[in-house]
């Protein structure tokens, strides 16, 4: 995370969003680091960005980009290999992930971002339909955005729902 993710965020973060808090959400698996990990905190300070590490809420698969399509896509690619041993399967997954096309991963990340907006729109509840944006068609037209932004009114409403609107300067 420190060697790859933070530099990637720093290099690609839009200038017009400077000063905005960036939240990195990870699931609760044991290999992940804690939000107050000292090495992570120092590395974030070096970026000059406001980056915070948070844990994925329990039972929220829509917030797991891997569950939104990446694993299924890798599985369908590796199923074609018919591995006979565990080592063959691991090698196949590693090969496929290294050769995984960026545009496919972008589609997964856009779905994740759209789910995040919907969760904010529904005051944190999960009673929404996963939005479909015709990503393939937009991609073919050269109109697929590299990222989604949260509409200001959705963000403000989410802050209001959390009862912290008064503490945030707009």
Model-derived segments and spans:
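Short, basic/hydrophobic alpha-helical segments
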Residues: 1-23
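A structural preference for long, well-packed, hydrophobic secondary-structure segments
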Residues: 9-13, 54-60, 73-80
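RNase H-like polynucleotidyl transferase catalytic core
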Residues: 25-28, 43-65
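C-terminal catalytic core of Y-nucleophile DNA break-rejoin enzymes
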Residues: 29-34
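Distinct, well-ordered alpha-helical segments
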Residues: 37-38
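C-terminal anion-handling pockets and recognition modules
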Residues: 66-170
């Amino acid at each position: 995370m420190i060697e790859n993710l933070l530099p990637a965020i720093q290099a690609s973060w839009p200038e017009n969003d400077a000063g905005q808090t960036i939240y990195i959400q990870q699931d609760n698996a044991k290999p992940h680091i804690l939000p107050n990990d000292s090495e992570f905190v120092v590395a974030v300070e070096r970026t000059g960005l406001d980056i915070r590490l948070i844990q994925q809420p329990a039972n929220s698969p829509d917030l797991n980009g891997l569950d939104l399509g990446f694993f299924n896509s890798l599985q369908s690619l590796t199923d074609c290999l018919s591995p006979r041993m565990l080592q063959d399967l691991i090698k196949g997954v590693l090969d496929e992930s290294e050769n995984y096309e960026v545009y496919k991963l972008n589609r997964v990340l856009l779905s994740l971002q759209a789910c995040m907006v919907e969760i904010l729109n529904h005051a944190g509840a999960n009673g929404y339909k996963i939005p479909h944006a015709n990503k393939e068609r937009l991609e073919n037209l050269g109109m697929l955005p590299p990222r989604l932004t949260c509409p200001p009114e959705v963000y403000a409403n989410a802050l209001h729902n959390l009862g912290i609107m008064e503490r945030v300067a707009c």
